[in-house]
Amino acid sequence: MRFSRLISALLVSACFSSSFVRPLYAADNIAIKSFPIAQFKVGSDEADFGSFRFMGGLELTSENDLVGAISGIRFFANRQDFIGVTDTGLWYKGQLLRDQNDSPSAVTDFQMAPIQNKNGMSSGSKWEFDAEGIALKGDKVFVSF
């Protein structure tokens, strides 16, 4: 049963590549407040975990009810621009700003838009567009549901 679900997810992902879906049509900017997270573990300055280093994080809030339920995020090569999907059938994009130590400091130019099928239709039904993950390959965007 798990294997058939995986195959179904992969097929759906292939159908929703950027050649069929245009996620980044014009959308209004959404105000995002960013609060830096300086420590991985409260009360500890430990930043190295094996070969990984915690560079910082952000707590993001917004007065816009659409913001939330983030399922996946991917950064482009410039490490600033990002794109992602939500559990509620939305795309989002924005830019991550970094401080002088290269730690995340804020999110700007944040926009959201409905995920659309190959016919340009979005859905008000969560189960049809409940995105769980996102991957980039060249100019294609793959979404898992």
Model features per residue range: what roles?
Residues 2-5, 15-145:
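Sequence/structural signature of beta-propeller domains
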